[in-house]
Structure formats: C-alpha cells, structure tokens
C-alpha cells in the first residue's frame, strides 16, 4: 500500500516537472514582436511581425505584405537609391491632376489620439489605429530601433490643440495608401526651432499613451 502511494507521488512529481520544463521551453520559444531584421537587413523591416491579435500593432499589420507583389530585389531597385528611400513627391499627399497636393489646414483638438511608426524626430502623424498599408511607408519603419517601442510604434494624445496639414495619402512603397496623414509645419505652430513630435511632447501639445 505504501509502495503504491510512493509510486503515485513519484509519478505526480515527474508530471509537474515535465509540465514545468515544457512550459518554460514554450515561453522561451515565443518570439518577440518585431524582433531581428528580415534577412539580416533592417531596411526590410523586422524578422517577426506581431499576430493580428497582438496589441497594439498586430491589427495594424494584419495581411501586410512588406514588398507588395514585388520581390525583394525589385522592391529595393525601385525604392532604394543607395543612401536612402525614394519618398513620394509632395510629402506623400494624394495629388490633383495638376500635381498639387490634396491637403488642408486642420486643428487637432484636445484628446485626439494619434500615432506614428518612426522616431519622435519625425514630422508626420496619423489617426491612431490606421492600418500600416494605408500609410504607404517603407518596411523599415516597423524595425525596432528602441526596445522600449516595439515595431517602432508610438501613440499619443493631444493635450493642447495645434494645427497641421492633413490630407489623403498616395499609394507608394507598393502599399495602397488612402489613409489620412498629418504633416507638421512650423508656420502653423508658434515657437522656435525645428517642429517635430519631440518638440510637441516637450512643449505640452502631446503626451505618450503607449
């Protein structure tokens, strides 16, 4: 009888140990979102993208194809000039038949939520939650340069109203575009020095909500 109890206890302990080991292996095997560089080249974005259910970036890249329907080499030949990306004309706004950008001045009111893929030294924003393909930006903008901001993603809330140029985004980088972008312009916001997201943060116009 006692031998049987000892055998059951040993089996129970072995099961717990095995389960714990397997759970640890599974946890270690789960990749971090937007980790590494695709094929060792950060221009191509991260090796691993979040699943559609992984907030906050997963839903924004669901179905995303980093090269569109092109191969890697054709994509780079079209959009990489040797020292940087070939960005679209007129700051990426959709163009009228005469080549003028479709944009208008808009005041972003307090509590408006915005985001961007890229460093805080940039001058473009979008409404929070816009799909990545509608932004028509390169795959490199998803690369994790700062581990504190996976997928290079930053989210903000307006704390003091300010004006921007807003308008529809033209297709580029083999992405559909069609979203709305907000372009910062020093002429629209009083102050000194270069106007970028970092300036808006330090001057009380935005707060981070990551």
Question: Over which residues does each language-model region extend?
Answer:
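Active-site or metal-binding loop neighborhoods of secreted/extracellular toxin and effector enzymes
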Residues: 163-210
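Generic detector of low-complexity/intrinsically disordered segments
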Residues: 9-14, 18-20, 46, 51, ...
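Secretory pathway export signals and precursors
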Residues: 29-30, 147
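ADP-ribose/NAD+-binding catalytic cleft of ART/PARP-like enzymes
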Residues: 31-123, 131-133, 153
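Secretory targeting and sorting signals
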Residues: 1-29
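ADP-ribosyltransferase catalytic core
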Residues: 119-123, 129-175
């Amino acid at each position: 009888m006692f031998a049987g109890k000892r055998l059951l206890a040993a089996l129970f302990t072995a099961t717990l140990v095995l389960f714990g080991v397997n759970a640890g292996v599974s946890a270690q095997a789960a990749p971090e979102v937007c980790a590494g560089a695709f094929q060792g080249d950060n221009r191509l974005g991260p090796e691993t993208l979040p699943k559609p259910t992984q907030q906050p970036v997963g839903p924004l890249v669901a179905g995303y194809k980093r090269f569109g329907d092109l191969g890697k080499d054709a994509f780079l030949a079209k959009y990489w000039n040797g020292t940087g990306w070939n960005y679209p004309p007129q700051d990426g706004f959709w163009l009228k038949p005469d080549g003028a950008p479709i944009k208008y001045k808009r005041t972003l009111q307090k509590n408006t939520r915005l985001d961007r893929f890229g460093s805080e030294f940039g001058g473009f924003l979008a409404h929070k939650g816009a799909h990545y393909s509608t932004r028509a930006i390169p795959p490199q903008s998803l690369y994790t340069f700062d581990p504190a901001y996976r997928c290079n993603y930053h989210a903000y809330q307006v704390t003091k109203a300010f004006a921007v140029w807003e308008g529809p985004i033209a297709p580029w980088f083999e992405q559909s575009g069609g979203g709305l972008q907000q372009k910062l312009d020093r002429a629209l916001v009083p102050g000194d020095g270069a106007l970028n997201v970092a300036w808006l943060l330090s001057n009380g116009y935005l707060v981070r909500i990551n």
